[in-house]
Amino acid sequence: MTMVNGFWRWLTADPRHGQITTLGLLLAYGAGGLGFDVSAAQCGVTVATALAVQWLGDGWRGAPRRSGAKSALISSLSLCLLLRTDDLAWAAAGAAIAVGSKFLIRVGGKHVFNPTNGALVALLLLTDAAWVSPGQWGAGAMAGFGFASAGLAVVHRSARSDVTLAFLAGYAALVLARAAWLGDPWAVPVHHLESGAFLLFAFFMISDPKTTPDSRAGRVLFALAVAAGAAWVHFRLFRPNGFLWALACASPFVPVLDRLLPALRYAWPAPIPSSLSLDWRSPMIRRSVVTLLTALALGPGLAPRAEAFCGFYVSRADTSLFNKASQVVLVRDGDRTVITMASDFRGSPREFAMVVPVPTAITREQIHVADAPIVAHLDAYTAPRLVEYYDGNPCAVPSPAAAMDAARAMGAMRQSVAEALKREKSLGVTIEARYTVGEYDILILSATQSSGLETWLRENGYRIPRGASEVLGSYIRQQMRFFVARVNLAEQARLGVATLRPIQVAYESPKFMLPLRLGMVNADGPQELFVYALTRKGRVESTNYRTVKLRTDVEIPAYVKDPAEFTKMYRAAFDRHVADEGGRAVFQEYAWDMAWCDPCAADPLSRDELRQLGVFWLDDAPAGPQPMARRPVAGPQDVFVTRLHVRYDAAHFPEDLVFHETGDRTNFQGRYVLRHAWTGPAACPQATAYYRQVAERHEREAQTLASLTGWSIDEIRARQGASPRPGPEPPDRAPRPVPPPVAWWRQLWKR
């Protein structure tokens, strides 16, 4: 009890103690519970750099060395939570900018920018190698932390809870008003307001008492301005991280508000009781600086390497494993997008119809019909895969080169015309354009009222589900058009096309999204969507739902090699992944440079295939097939592919999918590994230990498969059979001793 009382006294002695505690808990939860891509090395570099720069800044300013340690720790923990980068130098730069800006950018003795916010915005402007993942928290997971933080803000005399409350109220009012104007169900704004990024910003960034106006009236005005700016960035500019941009733009006006509405300036409790000393003689400071210098020196070694994968490719889990599976290829660079839509429609062509909201008007030249085999090739290339290894003779002495290859292998691991026009006008529907492209008749529609559009579509033979009017109305108020396609049977017969081909549309818009909601009206159960994003910079992720990597590089029993078993296993494993995430996640199944693969489930796409999919930035090098590359080729590659798998329904995905491109070029494959044991004779002492390890591995594989799929461990063990045993000795000779290894210098000069 004494320890609890002591901790409570420490927690309530200074508002910063509550922030440090909560940020530390959030970081532990994010890294351990949500699988954030933040390494211990990045956290160590960030914290050490922040403390070191604070120590230097205090000395330069002539302040007590220990005065700013807590603030520096808060800034560094916030950066660990929000900043994503694979380069430790940029992590250090972010911490240096955050803390250094407090000393360098000051007006009237007060630093202008929130340290963490300023550093994040600076890095987003300076490099593609750093990014922020606003969807990493998901929706709902942070609610408990939000309430806890609100309680801490009151109990710990933060004196800035008015900023948080004003921002929360202002932004929530704008989001709810927008939903009411669009006619969206309340699930849409609620999902938006449940975002962990939103709550984290409200409680830990905009509430910084050292960078907000001194007067209460000024703080409320400031918070409302940031809320309005964030809403503008999100809903008018269609850019992620609107909170960060809005706060950065509003911060320079804080000195103006302080001059117009003067009040007593906030000061931390004095004296500041601190166990964090920034005295150079302090062991903590010395350890921090040593950590920083060591991490920077070893950064390239700490960063993950692209190792070769030397297993044998066995099988893949392509889209044919799932019913109701649609495929979309998104080629994106800047605001330019080429979307390829491949439907799994299997009925009569005369029954086919497609209605897709599009963000802008579309001309004939922007529409194309693609070849289905190219999409199938992309699906095969990016599909989760099954690979296998064969153990070598445990009695053989591996050469140094073979040992190195084995280490690498273990490391690496998408009516009349006049009457018709009159009727369209009465329903508020305008046919902006009509085209015939390949085997499709295509209309580009705009509308002024959802009920009129719904009526027009039904009267013209399009089977629109009842209740679609509400969703159509939301898209109409967002000034979106409707891309409507049906099959021209005469053209299909003339072209000799038996299977409907994918439709491609090229357009330019800041909206990087996929409209899902219209397809969920009266949908018969969850639907599968595969998104293949082809980009220049790096991996694509969702900004409004959590993007979760498949569990990969796990060893499973060898009997799963049978294609039917692998199909069954992968379906069950994906079902389990979806359930574990509450049905609200987007799953990353593949992320890799298009120039190579290791192992390859299919050859990389040729330059000509990429151009046909819409990759418009390729240079003018000769087109045609490329040899399959199993190692990265020299120089940067221009096409990075991300495969995302979504199982969606209206209950779990109330909003359309919104994406952004990150600077992350880390290679990732959904990969399952089979290990075949050596079954030869146990002709040496090492074999006894080897077969003991095989028995243990045999059990681990069964446990892993049970964990992945939820299947009964007893049934898995029964299918798996007994652990491999040594084979019989050859009948004509006794076991021979293994000769000692030859000295390396004898091999060198052949003596």
Question: What function would you assign to each model-found segment?
Answer:
Residues 1-58:
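N-terminal signal-anchor module of multipass membrane proteins
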Residues 4-22, 175-278:
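C-terminal transmembrane helix-loop-helix hairpin of multi-pass membrane proteins
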Residues 5-6, 52-64, 97-111, 149-159, ...:
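C-terminal ends of transmembrane helices
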Residues 64-138:
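Membrane-interface helix-loop-helix junctions at boundaries between adjacent transmembrane segments
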Residues 127-184:
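Internal active-site segments that recognize and position negatively charged phosphoryl groups
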Residues 307, 311-321, 408-412, 464-704, ...:
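Accessory, solvent-exposed terminal regions and/or long lumenal/extracellular loops of proteins
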Residues 331-394, 453-474, 479:
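Surface-exposed, glycine/proline- and aromatic-rich loop segments on solvent-exposed faces
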Residues 362-437, 446, 621-626:
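A cross-kingdom signal targeting lumenal/periplasmic-facing segments of multi-pass membrane
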